[in-house]
């Protein structure tokens, strides 16, 4: 799984300096963080709607499709902020085995 994320991160990084008209990702970078966040918000809503539809229909294909879009645009956002998806994976690893209540209490105490 992480190989796919790493490969995608490399592509996203390579598009930062590309001409805006050379790719969709390059055009997002050139439009700036606000446009990237707008797309991320749109994808979040589309994922939620797909999940609600899947709960009724039992067909999760749109949920998978929309979640892929959500992850993709999340990675574009991270790259725009100079972050690699490994930082998110590291955070998930840190939380693994930690009760949600304990993790939340640790955040509140900081």
UniProtKB/Swiss-Prot annotation:
Its main location: cytoplasm. Pathway: Amino-acid biosynthesis; L-histidine biosynthesis; L-histidine from 5-phospho-alpha-D-ribose 1-diphosphate: step 2/9. The keyword Disulfide bond does not apply. It catalyses: 1-(5-phospho-beta-D-ribosyl)-ATP + H2O = 1-(5-phospho-beta-D-ribosyl)-5'-AMP + diphosphate + H(+). It holds the Pfam family PRA-PH. It comes from the Bacteria. GO terms for biological process: L-histidine biosynthetic process. GO terms for molecular function: ATP binding; phosphoribosyl-ATP diphosphatase activity. The keyword Nucleotide-binding applies. Its EC number is 3.6.1.31. PANTHER family: HISTIDINE BIOSYNTHESIS BIFUNCTIONAL PROTEIN, HISTIDINE BIOSYNTHESIS BIFUNCTIONAL PROTEIN HISIE. HAMAP family: HisE (MF_01020). This is Phosphoribosyl-ATP pyrophosphatase. The gene is hisE.
